[in-house]
């Protein structure tokens, strides 16, 4: 989770310090960006399979907390595991980056939040950037009756909420304004922030089961951990060596995530927003054109014929009625040349040749399937959320990221898919990273190092800064030279971020592509996401 905070005044020190409610924090000065960094600051304690607890440690001026290096990351599978990050249960920490006027030397790409802070100073709207670690997988989102009865479900969300509270209480010590906090990608209490940015992840588009639907997975994990006969199974798991528990958790084939527990999540979020039970703040949200590539790649199923695509849908959505699947197949024709984006392929098409060249499987209906799953997971939910937010009379700004950051030859990014405007492709542009520079671990694709994409990165970055600072992405330093990004309720349109190698291509599109198909996805969200749970109208 990221948060941005407007800066109230400039401040710096050769060894910067801040006095928080827990005492003195000492950071490090980064001369290449003229910034102060405070890294790995604990914001809560994380007892295993229990709710987060406030920090009870104090630091005095003579023995300050050393915030000169990143802290541990929370246990999770995939990128955290494969890319050499230091994982630990002691992981509830955050990082703060703020401007500090001083002269420096060459750039260091390690600090990927530094670019957006640097740009905010150039735009004369300085801000602080805060990134937050929170618990993941089973340790962050345990399911089953035992977890629900103990009140320890959705722990990762509770971590986020406590982090936001810590920021509210302490950000003034770092020069920030607690009344001007914008949350990016997270959910928390409404009194804690004044705006939100949601990219490629919304209130629908992912399974959100009830707690008891996770019981079989919990029982399997308990059995493999030799805790079946324990009177208190949770306490037994708390006492199990992590070296035993961690591989078990990753081997049982259960995707641990948020659950409808009747407590933190009392009902499906889509219905809460529909009924107006949400934090009423300005919202900036958007999707990438090729969001579905990651879903098809993750499925390991690459259809060549319509009956194979049918199997993919039936497997992915077992509660979806066959008549609905037939409707979807009709609305995503095999010959998708006129669709947006086009997805018509054959086995000998350049796409599949390029996929095979890097030892990735392919099928002639790969892009057709990706269009379906991309609409389900991102485009339909993004449109639905923009519509709901606008109906509440709230400022809503919707975007569509179309720039292909990579193309053919294929560059495969583990966990994301084969390039193009795929899931995560916009991240380097939002952060304002220069062309060719990505995150320190090179997990997400870098901004393309050509003039058109460098201009695109700067434009997205400054729009994000304006939204954080002014709650309006049009409040730019040179706004008269820029295309107007209209609110969704006045235009039903998306602001399109696109570029060729040579030229920036900003424009506005009517938000009606694949409208009928997207509506079917949203009409059936109770069956795709909520296990046939259809809440009562209120």
Tell where the protein language model's regions lie, with residue ranges.
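Catalytic-loop region of hydrolases
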Residues: 5-102, 243, 534-537
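Extracellular/periplasmic catalytic domains that process cell-envelope and extracellular macromolecules
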Residues: 19, 29-32, 85-89, 121-124, ...
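N-linked glycosylation sites
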Residues: 22, 56, 72, 112, ...
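Serine-hydrolase-like catalytic core of hydrolytic proteins
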Residues: 40, 75-234, 263-299, 455, ...
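Non-transmembrane alpha-helical segments in soluble domains
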Residues: 117, 161-164, 168, 218-222, ...
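Polar, glycine-rich mid-to-C-terminal structural blocks
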Residues: 234-253
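Substrate-gating cap/lid region and adjacent catalytic-acid/histidine neighborhood
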Residues: 248-451
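Alpha/beta-hydrolase-fold serine-hydrolase catalytic core, especially in secreted/extracellular enzymes
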Residues: 444-538
């Amino acid at each position: 989770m990221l948060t941005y905070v407007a800066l109230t005044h400039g401040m710096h020190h050769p060894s910067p310090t801040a006095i928080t409610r827990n005492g003195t924090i000492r950071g490090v000065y980064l001369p290449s960006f003229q910034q102060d960094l405070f890294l790995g600051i604990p914001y809560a304690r994380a007892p295993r399979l229990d709710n987060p607890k406030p920090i009870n440690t104090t630091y005095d001026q003579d023995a300050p907390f050393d915030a000169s290096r990143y802290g541990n990351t929370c246990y999770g599978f995939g990128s955290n595991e494969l890319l050499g990050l230091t994982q630990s249960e002691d992981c509830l920490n955050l990082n703060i980056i703020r401007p500090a006027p001083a002269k420096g030397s060459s750039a260091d790409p390690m600090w990927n939040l530094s670019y957006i802070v640097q740009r905010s100073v150039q735009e004369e709207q300085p801000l602080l950037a805060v990134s937050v670690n929170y618990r993941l997988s089973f340790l962050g989102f345990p399911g089953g009756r035992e977890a629900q009865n103990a009140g320890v479900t959705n722990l990762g969300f509770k971590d986020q909420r406590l982090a936001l509270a810590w920021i509210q209480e302490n950000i003034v010590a770092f020069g920030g304004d607690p009344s001007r906090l914008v949350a990016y990608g997270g959910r928390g209490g409404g009194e804690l922030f004044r705006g939100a940015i949601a990219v490629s992840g919304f209130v629908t588009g992912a399974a959100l089961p009830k707690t008891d639907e996770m019981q079989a997975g919990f029982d399997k994990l308990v059995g493999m951990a030799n805790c079946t006969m324990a009177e208190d199974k949770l306490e037994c798991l708390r006492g199990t060596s992590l070296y035993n528990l961690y591989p078990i958790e990753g081997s049982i084939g259960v995707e641990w995530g948020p659950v409808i527990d009747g407590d933190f999540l009392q009902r499906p979020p889509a219905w809460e927003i529909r009924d107006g039970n949400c934090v009423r703040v300005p919202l900036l949200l958007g999707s990438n054109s090729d969001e579905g590539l990651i879903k098809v790649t993750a499925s390991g199923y690459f259809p060549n014929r319509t009956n194979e695509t049918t199997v993919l849908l039936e497997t992915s959505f077992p509660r979806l009625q066959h008549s609905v699947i037939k409707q979807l197949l009709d609305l995503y024709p095999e010959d998708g040349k006129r669709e947006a984006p086009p997805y018509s392929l054959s086995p000998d098409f350049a796409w599949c040749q390029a996929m095979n060249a890097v030892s990735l499987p392919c099928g002639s209906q790969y892009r057709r399937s990706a269009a379906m799953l991309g609409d389900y997971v991102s485009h339909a939910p993004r449109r639905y959320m923009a519509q709901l937010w606008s109906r509440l009379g709230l400022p809503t700004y919707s975007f569509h990221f179309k720039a292909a950051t990579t193309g053919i030859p294929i560059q495969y990014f583990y966990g994301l898919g084969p390039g193009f405007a795929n899931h995560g492709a916009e991240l380097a542009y939002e952060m304002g990273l220069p062309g060719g520079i990505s995150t320190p671990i090179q997990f997400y694709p870098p901004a393309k190092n050509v003039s058109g994409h460098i201009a695109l990165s700067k434009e997205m970055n400054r729009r994000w800064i304006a939204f954080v600072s002014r709650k309006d992405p049009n409040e730019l330093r040179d706004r008269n030279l820029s295309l107007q990004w209209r609110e969704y309720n006045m235009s039903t349109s998306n602001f399109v971020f696109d570029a060729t190698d040579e030229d920036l291509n900003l424009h506005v599109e009517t938000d009606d592509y694949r409208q009928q198909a997207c509506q079917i996805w949203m009409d059936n969200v109770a069956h795709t996401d909520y296990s046939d749970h259809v809440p009562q109208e209120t």
